[in-house]
A protein has these predicted regions:
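N-terminal activation segment of mature serine protease catalytic domains
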Residues: 6-85, 107, 249
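Hydrophobic membrane-insertion alpha-helices, especially the h-region
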Residues: 1-3
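Active-site substrate-binding loop(s) of clan PA
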Residues: 61-62, 121-123, 140-168, 243
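Catalytic-histidine neighborhood of serine endopeptidases
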Residues: 90-92, 96-130, 136-141
Length: 249
């Protein structure tokens, strides 16, 4: 997850898991280009963001609904691997994650919570927004997430995060908190990003994973957390940031 500045603290990318060489994780700004095979002429996909309907779900119901749509993303680097999180966008295999998860990668694959893995190709890569879209080629439909309308999110709303903190050993970890701020302007290496702020715990390996509302809808892509030092090992807790999904769609 990413880095920037706010007072005496810094917003740092959530480094992506513990891979074989954790130091190979790079900040998206000024990062290395990826050589992951790109699908030429792919039209991509447009997200359909829905307003909440029905009653809020329990934490257990949210996890049961969303976790099957959360994948581990492994980007093979020249030395070691970068490990992050991603979200299945469509049943035919489109996956969204952070650009810094796959930056510098030579090949990439994703793993479902069932353990099934797919090699993926690159559809889109945007360093400015720290987003990447990958494409698997599954024989059977994948469990796509439901995406919510992040424009409706308010401070105090319940928020959940699911991902792979510290790598694959803890994959599928869910944390919870609230939406601490909306439209938070965060400066990262001289660039300003407008993000959702959350108190849900985000750690190494959560990059590219979902921020979820109490209806089990993905409302953001987890990207940053606050650090008090130049180290990617952030020492401040409860200050995480996500790209609003409405800006992604």
């Amino acid at each position: 997850i990413l880095g920037g500045s706010s007072g005496s603290g810094q917003h740092r990318p959530l480094p992506d898991g513990d891979g074989d060489n954790p130091s190979s994780i790079v900040d998206i700004f000024g990062s290395k280009a990826t050589s992951i095979p790109r699908i030429q002429g792919d039209p991509g996909v447009r997200l359909a963001c829905r307003d909440p309907q029905g009653q809020p779900l329990t934490a257990q119901e949210v996890y049961a609904k969303v976790n099957p749509s959360v994948v581990t993303v492994v980007s093979e680097q020249s030395e070691g691997a970068s490990i992050g999180t991603g979200v299945i966008m469509t049943a035919d295999g489109y996956v969204i994650t952070n650009a810094h998860v796959i930056s510098g990668g030579k090949s990439c694959w994703v793993a479902l919570d069932t353990g099934v893995t797919y090699e993926v190709n690159l559809v889109g890569f945007d360093e400015e927004e720290d987003l990447a879209v990958l494409k698997a080629d599954p024989q059977n439909p994948l469990p796509a997430a439901e995406f919510g309308n992040s424009d409706l999110v308010q401070v105090g709303d319940t928020a959940y995060a699911i991902g792979n903190p510290l790598g694959v050993e803890l994959r599928g970890t869910m944390t919870n908190g609230i939406i601490s701020a909306v439209n938070r302007a965060v400066e990262v290496d001289g660039k300003t990003m407008t993000l959702l702020q959350t108190s849900a715990a985000l750690n190494n390996g959560n990059s590219g994973g979902p921020l979820i509302n109490e209806y089990g809808q993905v409302i953001g892509i987890n990207t940053l957390k606050m650090s008090t030092t130049d180290s990617t090992e952030a020492t401040v807790e409860g200050l995480g940031f996500a790209l609003p999904i409405s800006s992604v769609s």
